[in-house]
Structures are given as C-alpha cells and as structure tokens.
Amino acid sequence: MTQLQSLRGMVDLLPQALQRWQAVESVARTHFQRSGFGEIRTPVMEPTDLFCRGIGEATDVVGKEMYTFNDRGDRSCTLRPEGTASVVRAALQHGLLSQGPQKLWYAGPMFRYERPQAGRQRQFHQIGVEWLGAASARADVEVIALAWDLLASLGVGGLELELNSLGSTDDRCAYRTALVAWLEQRSNLLDEDSRARLNTNPLRILDSKNKATQALLDGAPTLANSLAPESRERFEVVQQGLASLGIPFRLSPRLVRGLDYYCHTAFEITSDQLGAQATVCGGGRYNGLIGQLGGPDTPAVGWALGMERLLLVVEAAANADPDGDSARLTAVVPPNAYLVNRGEQAEKAALILARSLRCAGLVIELDNSGASFSKQFKRADRCGARWALVLGDEEVEKGEVRIKPLSDESDDFFLGLHDLTGLLAKLTAM
C-alpha cells in the first residue's frame, strides 16, 4: 500500500519546531498587548467574493493563487490567502467599528497556490496587526515601529526598512495614466508577464523580478512625481516620525505591494540574515478597503509577517550568535527531570510523583516503557534533562527517591519520596 504523504506545499509542524514557533508567537503577543492590540480569530474559509472585492480581481493572488471551490450548497468558497480582508469582514459583521477605532492582531494559516520553496509554502502562516479607524500619519509610524521593535527583540539582524508612498486614489490614477503611456511605447521590451499587466494592473510592473524590465523602468515616470501636495506632506510626516524614533529607512519608489487595497504609506522590512535581503514583514495603509467591503469609508493601516520566513531568519541569527536573543528564544527547553522507574510499586509511585511535580509547575518526563534501567538512563541522557529521578521498588520501600545528576559526574544522592519541597528546591536550583 502506498504510504500517504502531506500535499505538496503543506508542511507538518513537529514538536521541536513548534517550541521555537510558540516562543516567537509569545514575544509577538507581548508586543501587541503593550501597544493595545487585541487578538481576533477568523475562519480559514470565506466567501470568494470577499477576496475578489477586497484584494482585487486583477491581482496574482485572486487570478492565479487562491484555493477556490463550490461547497455542497453551491456557494463559492475560498481558503483565505491573507488576513486583512477577513479581519475587516469580521469587524463589519460584528459592528466593531461603531465602538470606535479597533486595534486588532491575528495569527493563523493562509493558503496560496505558489511554487513551494524555503520559507514559502502553499499553506503558510502569518502574524499581523490591523488598526481600523486610524487616520493619522503618526499611526503609520506607530505600526511600523511595532514591527521593527518586534523583529529587533527576536534578535533579527541586518534589518532594512523600505518605504514608499502610493498616494491617494487620484494620485495613483494620474500616475497610472502616465506610466501606461510611457510603457506602451516600449511594450516590445517588456517581459511577457509585464505585457499582460499593462492594461490590467500596470503598477505591479514596477515590482517585476525580470532584470531587463527593471533596467527599462529606470527611465520610467515615478509615482513620487504624481503625488498631490497633501500626499507629499503626509509622507513627510511619516518619514520625520520614523527619524525621530531612530528607525532608519530607505525610500523605494518602486515598492507597490501585491494587493490593490494599499494607498499612501507602503513598506517592507527585510533582513540579510539569510545571506541576501529577504522580506520578513510588509504592510501599509488601506483607506478604501472597508468601504469596498460595504462599510463606511474608514482609514486603516496594518502589516503582516510570514512565520515560516521569520523562523528561518531567527534560526540563522541564533546560529550566527549562540549567546544572542534569537538563540535563547529558539532553544528547545528540556524537561526539569526524567523519571526513571522499574518495578510494580515503583511504577505506581512514579506516576504519583510525576503528577505532583507537574502540578507544582515542573516539566517531568515519565518513562512508562518498563525497560531496563540502563535503557531508561540512555533516554534520560538524550532528552537533555539535568536530573534523573530514579525509583525502584527498593527506593519505594525506603520512602526515598534517588537523584542522579545528568549534566555532570557528581555523585547521586537521596531525598525523601514525599519531600516535595526538597525535590522542588533541588530540581529548580541553577
């Protein structure tokens, strides 16, 4: 019989990897709480129209990458490819915006049919924040600073913030006209994908990875030249705010992001921790999305980071600096003790002892194999515990437990089997 495998691009997360994963999530949760963001959880499956209206039908995400199907009620459903549209839908459905601005964060799986590669899978995971009802340019600065500080606290090095302004809807309309006119005169020099985008989503041509197209764009009109005075002033406030916080940035005039709902501030944070600059976080302002989805015109700003890519970066940082923040975060936490036991009475006593120590807050690995003491000691060494607690029927009869150090060659010693205070003091001693 053929062995069943996970689908391509759908990766199992095993216990050791999840310890690192949860450590990163815990740090993120702390940062979000300190900044006043509350967690929201939305379904992984949504009506397809949510993403067609929200993301834009001309985008690659909607046109090429979504997992879409009809359910048994013949409703078109889609596994969510990103989190923002779902958060906005939930906020509208539950009337959250009537209560004033909402600061929300989320974490969970997303789905896109892309070519799997390191740090990018077809089921991938994002952590993101959405500040609904935030009109001020200072809010843009605050959410960018939140992302920057989170990544820095994870020990991620080589960070670079790329920044651009996409302007207002009118600004982009004027720029689109100028860009299309310029590109149409040179359409024979464009790569195939860029020619296809010329009449559907021309701004995405700026993000082309084709080297010849990038070289051609060096002479193209820039979006900055199409910004109205109000948009320029707003962008200047963002830059000044970041400078006042000591957050360095680089203006990137071709940064447009991949989703249609962005306006004004757009940004990406990259890291060279993997050898080349890799994007670990991206976002920006989206003042029109809530209105597009049936709500009142409401300004908003947010970002998302990809957990798979971030974990690669964090682990690279840990390898580069074994004593740094990343190494401490990604270290697999071993149990406080491994409970070795053999014999009918010892097995009963070991179960009671393990439960008592766990209830007191310790991590105890209880061996239930019934194997020989030598085999159990080998397992104890492999698990990384500092101590082995040894119980045989003889120890139980004497009312004691043998403590065997595993991290050095010091002598074994005994403590009372029911001396929980003494055991706790010893097992938690540095």
Swiss-Prot record:
Q: What is its main location?
A: cytoplasm
Compartments where found? Cytoplasm
Q: Which GO terms describe its molecular function?
A: ATP binding; histidine-tRNA ligase activity
Q: What class of enzyme is it?
A: ligase
List the catalytic activities from the record: tRNA(His) + L-histidine + ATP = L-histidyl-tRNA(His) + AMP + diphosphate + H(+)
One GO term describing the cellular component: cytoplasm
* Keyword line: Aminoacyl-tRNA synthetase, ATP-binding, Cytoplasm, Ligase, Nucleotide-binding, Protein biosynthesis
Q: According to the UniProt entry, what is the EC number of this protein? A: 6.1.1.21
What Pfam families does the annotation carry?
A: HGTP_anticodon (PF03129), tRNA-synt_His (PF13393)
Q: What InterPro entries does the entry give?
A: aa-tRNA-synth_II (IPR006195), aa-tRNA-synth_II/BPL/LPL (IPR045864), Anticodon-bd (IPR004154), Anticodon-bd_dom_sf (IPR036621), His-tRNA-ligase (IPR015807), HisRS-like_core (IPR041715), HisRS/HisZ (IPR004516), HisRS_anticodon (IPR033656)
Please give a single GO biological process term from the UniProt record.
histidyl-tRNA aminoacylation
The record's listing under Gene3D superfamilies reads: Anticodon-binding domain, Bira Bifunctional Protein, Domain 2
Give the CDD domains listed for this entry.
HisRS-like_core, HisRS_anticodon
According to the record's subunit comment, the protein's assembly and interactions are: Homodimer.
Family under the similarity heading: Belongs to the class-II aminoacyl-tRNA synthetase family.
**What HAMAP family does the record tag this protein with?**
His_tRNA_synth (MF_00127)
| Protein's UniProt name | Histidine--tRNA ligase
Source species taxonomy: Bacteria, Bacillati, Cyanobacteriota, Cyanophyceae, Synechococcales
The encoding gene: hisS
